[in-house]
Structure formats: structure tokens, C-alpha cells
Amino acid sequence: MYARCGRPSIAPEKLLRAQLLQMLYSVRSERLLMEEIDYSMLYRWFVGLYLDEEVWDATSFTKNRDRLLEADVAKKFLKCVVERARNAGLTSEEHFTVDGTLLEAWASLKSFQPKNQKAKTPPDDSGNPTVDFHGKRRSNDTHISSSDPDAKLARKGPGKEAKLSYSGNLLVENRNGLIVNAELLEANGRAERDAALLMLEQVPGTKRVTAGVLTRDTIRLNSLRSVVISELHRTWPETKARRGGSAIDARTVHHPGYLLSQRRRKRIEECFGWLKDTAMLRKLKHRELFRVG
């Protein structure tokens, strides 16, 4: 009645533990991860495999990824970790830092083609076609990536190289530098501001929340909506002051708590550095916002 060649079922928590190992120890692929779990007693113990138990096939991650995404397991996993830290008194519910970074999409600039482009002749090289886009004006309004339609052409600042990217945003509490929330949005120029408001809405408690925001765009947002943010989100902006005028009054700038907050803001950059270098998220391994996020 049942096939004899089928694979045994895998508990979702074991898949999550294995993927956590992949990020913590910078394992570049899931196939290599299975090889290392096979001969590492430490990895087997952490994942929950006996010494004589066979490891899974690397395609098990691919086949189960959609199920994990549909149930939003990664978000729930982070929420449980944050809740345990909060119960242990390791997090603050008052002082936070919000910032965003660009994560390079798994798509090349050659795939960034005009939206209304008509069918062309076959390329000279199907594996790596020649595309001459120098001197041509390209924007997200007129072009779209054929490899990853959700990726947007963006750059972090003036003079920086523009790449197909997503906007990764973090909410970090300042007391211990723990990540308490994360949002991935399209890099559309408003992502950091939208993500900041979205994550601050989810901060528990009734106390007033202070949020240090690092970007110039969000500073302009705070100058226009500081009253709205304070009333609706129990949030008071502690943005970095600018020369030639700032949205922050002098009383806030000279307060000892503000100076301490400015020194703690660097911790969110350390989180971004770990995610990009150790967890290997500098260049994403999946496509489409639903899968990447």
C-alpha cells in the first residue's frame, strides 16, 4: 500500500536548527551542510540526530521551504527567541535603534530589462549573453528584472554603485544590542521609513519608547510627523543631529540619555555586519520577496 523507497518525515524544528547552524558557522550551501552534519557529533547533537541515524538529502530543504514560508515559521521563531530574552530580563522595552541596509538580490544587471520590451533575436551566448546598457537611462519605473521581479535598482548613497537589492531593516534594543524585530521590503526609497513605523507599532508595553533612527530620510520624516509618532506609537525620535539644522530640540540633544543612545547606535551596524559576513546574507540565495523575507 505504501512505497518502500520513500523518505522519512523530518520535524520542522530540526530543519530550523540545521539552518541556524548554516548561518552561525558560515556554511555556504545546504549540500555542504549535510556533509558536515554527517561527520560532526556537535552538529548531530544540536540538530537532534543519533550517531547511527542517516542525514537528510539536501533537497529536503527545498521541498519544505515553501511550507515553512507559508506558515511564517521564521518570524515566529524570532518572536519566541525575543520572548525568552524578555522574560529573562535581557531586553529593554524603552530604548531602540532602527536602521536599514541594502541586501544584494540574486540577479544581475543584465536581467534588468525594459518592461515593454518586445521579443528579440536569440542572444549570441545563451549562458552569458552580451548586454550593452552603458549610456542608457534605467529606472525602476521603466525596467524590471527578468530573474527577480521584486528586486529594485538601488544604491546606499551618492557615488555608490547601484545594484538590484532588497531593503533589510532591523529594530535593535540599545541596552544589550539584541535584535527584536526585522522586516524585509522592496528597496523603493520609502522602505526604511515604512519599516521603522511598522516595527515600532509592534513594540509591547505602554511606556514611552525612544527610537534612534540613523537615516537622513527618516530624519525628515520625524520632523514632519514627530507628534503623530509620539502619540500613536509612544515613540520619541532620537535621530542623529545634522549640521545646519535638526529636527531635535536642544533639550533632547544635551540630555545624558541622548548622548548614551548615540554611543549605543553602533550596535545595529554590528548586527548588519554579522548578517552579511557570518550569515552570508550580503548576497541573497533566493528570489522573490516572499521567499527572501
Language model regions located:
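Basic, short loop/linker segments at the boundary and entry of helix-turn-helix/winged-helix-like folds
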Residues: 1-20, 25
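Phosphate-backbone recognition surface of nucleic-acid-processing proteins
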Residues: 44-62, 242-259
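Helix-centered, glycine/charged polyanion-binding patches within enzymatic domains
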Residues: 117-121, 130-134, 138, 216-293
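Structural motif
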Residues: 5-13, 161, 263, 287-293
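Short alpha-helix plus adjacent loop in nuclease-associated cores
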Residues: 6, 65-69, 262
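Short, solvent-exposed positions on alpha-helices
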Residues: 28-35
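Polybasic low-complexity intrinsically disordered regions
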Residues: 35-38, 49-227, 233, 293
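Acidic, metal-coordinating catalytic cores used for nucleic-acid/nucleotide bond scission
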Residues: 6-10, 41, 212-221, 240-242
